[in-house]
A protein has these predicted regions:
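A short glycine-rich, aromatic-capped structural motif
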Residues: 1-86, 96-120
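Functional-site microenvironments in short loops/helix caps that host divalent-cation chemistry
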Residues: 4-5, 11, 16, 86-99, ...
């Protein structure tokens, strides 16, 4: 599921001296608006659902599916034996809940757009606005943009309050979700720091020394008991 990340202002970039003298990540103050982010990484099962959908809709265009497949050769490294991971990591049921790897930026962006359409399609189907079409093809599969353009006719059995007088849902009705996307570099670093709760007037004034929210050596959270770096 998605978790809300409260926005704020923080110092982005390296805050310690660069031992290699690269200085390619100089600290600067950045303001991040509130946003939502997945609580966990996209799993192999999530991405396999995407591949399965592409295989069904683009069954006559195997190159579309091929271009979406992750690069499993990323597991190969010199002086190591990772052939089992190359061969089974993505598809074996044992790794279904593991994060998908070997996905390029373009592939991840395409997945995010696909996910946006599938989520909004399910919302409309659950609300009775649309009936699910099991026979979608490359020429008639659902997209949010095509629906908002008026290319779909809503059902007469839609739930009260979900549609306008023309039985259509608009973005301003608050039912459809905005498009999923990859986080920006600032959003990713801000979320990874986990500094919510350490703000003063929307400003992050201190970074965490330890994984827990305090400068003490011990934490009351059982997950961190025994953790000491």
């Amino acid at each position: 599921g998605l978790v809300a990340i409260e926005g704020g202002t923080f110092t982005m970039g390296a805050t310690m001296e660069s031992v290699h003298y690269e200085w390619n990540n100089n600290p600067r103050k950045v303001t991040v608006s509130s946003f939502y982010m997945d609580q966990t990484e996209v799993s192999n099962l999530d991405y396999l659902e995407y591949i399965n959908w592409l295989s069904r809709v683009y069954k006559d265009y195997p190159e579309v599916v091929k271009n979406a497949l992750p690069d499993t050769l990323v597991w190969r490294k010199s002086l190591s034996y990772n052939e089992p991971m190359v061969e089974i990591y993505f598809r074996h049921p044992s790794y279904r809940d593991y994060p998908v790897v070997g996905v390029s930026w373009r592939q991840a962006n395409d997945y995010a757009l696909w996910r946006s359409d599938r989520v909004n399609e399910k919302i409309l189907v659950d609300a009775g606005v649309l009936s699910y079409n099991n026979n979608q093809t490359k020429d008639n599969f659902f997209t949010t943009d095509s629906y908002l353009s008026g290319l779909y006719k809503s059902n007469a059995t839609a739930q009260a309050g979900t549609t306008d007088v023309n039985n259509n849902v608009k973005m301003e009705d608050g039912i459809l979700l905005p498009k999923y996307r990859l986080p920006t570099e600032a959003e990713w670093e801000y979320a990874a720091l986990g500094l919510i709760g350490n703000t003063e007037s929307e400003n992050i004034v201190e970074r965490k020394v330890y994984p827990w929210n305090s400068n003490g050596l011990r934490s009351n959270q059982p997950d961190y008991m025994g953790t000491m770096v």
